[in-house]
Curated annotation (Swiss-Prot):
Record function comment: Substrate recognition component of the SCF (SKP1-CUL1-F-box protein)-type E3 ubiquitin ligase complex, SCF(FBXO3), which mediates the ubiquitination and subsequent proteasomal degradation of target proteins. Mediates the ubiquitination of HIPK2 and probably that of EP300, leading to rapid degradation by the proteasome. In the presence of PML, HIPK2 ubiquitination still occurs, but degradation is prevented. PML, HIPK2 and FBXO3 may act synergically to activate p53/TP53-dependent transactivation.
GO MF term (any one): ubiquitin-like ligase-substrate adaptor activity
GO biological process, one term: SCF-dependent proteasomal ubiquitin-dependent protein catabolic process
Family matches, as PROSITE patterns: APAG, FBOX
Cross-referenced PANTHER family: F-BOX ONLY PROTEIN 3
Transmembrane segments: none
CDD domains registered for this protein in UniProt: F-box_FBXO3
InterPro entries recorded: ApaG_domain (IPR007474), ApaG_sf (IPR036767), F-box-like_dom_sf (IPR036047), F-box_dom (IPR001810), F-box_SCF_Substrate_Recog (IPR052121), Knr4/Smi1-like_dom (IPR018958), Knr4/Smi1-like_sf (IPR037883)
UniProt key word Nucleus: yes
Residue ranges constituting the ApaG domain according to the UniProt record: 278-408
Protein name: F-box only protein 3
Species, as recorded: Mus musculus
Keywords: Nucleus, Ubl conjugation pathway
Amino acid sequence: MAAVEAETGLLTLESLPTDPLLLILSFVDYRDLINCCYVSRRLSQLSTHDPLWRRHCKKYWLISEEEKAGKSQCWRSLFIETYSDVGRYIDHYAAIKKAWRDLKKYLEPRCPRMVLSLKEGAREEDLDAVEAQIGCKLPDDYRCSYRIHNGQKLVVPGLLGSMALSNHYRSEDLLDVDTAAGGFQQRQGLKYCLPLTFCIHTGLSQYIAVEAAEGRNKNEVFYQCPDQMARNPAAIDMFIIGATFTDWFTSYVNNVVSGGFPIIRDQIFRYIHDPECVATTGDITVSVSTSFLPELSSVHPPHYFFTYRIRIEMSRDALPEKACQLDSRYWRITNAKGDVEEVQGPGVVGEFPIISPGRIYEYTSCTTFSTTSGYMEGYYTFHFLYFKDKVFNVAIPRFHMACPTFRVSIARLEMGPDEYEEMEEEAEEEEEEENDDSADMDESDESDADENESDEGEGEARRRRVFDVPIRRRRCSRLF
């Protein structure tokens, strides 16, 4: 061989010195590195060079130097050992493990009870047993996540976020795989759907489609939204939350750890804040964050429910005589069709807050649209505490609200034209009756009605069997 190389003057790969060969092998993927073992004795020896496997351990398994130091194993044996355990998830493991690691690191000092509620990872045989029970294969990225943490204990607050209004509360727990399997759906409208989350207060769940059926794409994550205009219980529309489990989980975690979702009273609140949605008037700054509530919304009839959280803050550098009190609010509300509604009233949510240097006042309210999106803007009127006759307006920045992408139930798409027209007429009659009733109510009456609805809703939730029936949506009063 050497004689042939000397005669031809060619330089083969194996004739290269060790260092250049190791450099080349450092760019080779783990599969090709393993295959090098079968090419020649020399490549087989070089492919076991331990530093080559350090990169793969960090890339695929996120094993740190500190973790390695705590084990009496080389990088290569660590890679092989981990691969033998979770190798089937190698395309998902790094993204899922990073999301879990980042989430726990962020929540430990802020929501320690939530982190303590997480369960240990499930075993492969546990996941296999669930697949046998439901008769469907679980997505690999779902299985991968549950190998790390098998959901959480059904406690409040839930890991997947909360939302609170004066007469409504939601907190979603991440279900363990056995509880989820008990809620696996075989009925029409949600066939082959597995619940991911559950709220013990509202019965709300997010589902993942483990098979493509009834117009859903495989692995899609969604909120169910029963069609309230159809007589067919299988008519269930969907608000799409994620294309896959990985997309759904990692995007949620990114919103949490980036500070996009605020932590309020040891809970994650699913408000989205646009950094540009801030307005400053003099020493007062107003910022807004919003959230869509699927459990209080419907596609048929079109009723999209949003809540918004407003923060009013006076600069610490403001002079003491700039202290002021909010007198009234003015809103200009525009839907996607360009229809405008103007609302003016005293105070905010029944209060007349005093703002002084360094003080922050926050409140939550809600609104609804008959279109999938809309926006609000307006101003507050204040008077100075030391100069009560002097009033001024503070701008509220324009903030946009839009519901997630939704998909209409195939049961509605298969509906005949006569049946559809009849449903539309019934819905219009119901809407007219609701409008007539609401026109006779003043603000205090609305508040009383809200409290009664809340009490009734709690009783209804206690009576409802978990995962048994679609959520019956109740309309909260529109607040400004």
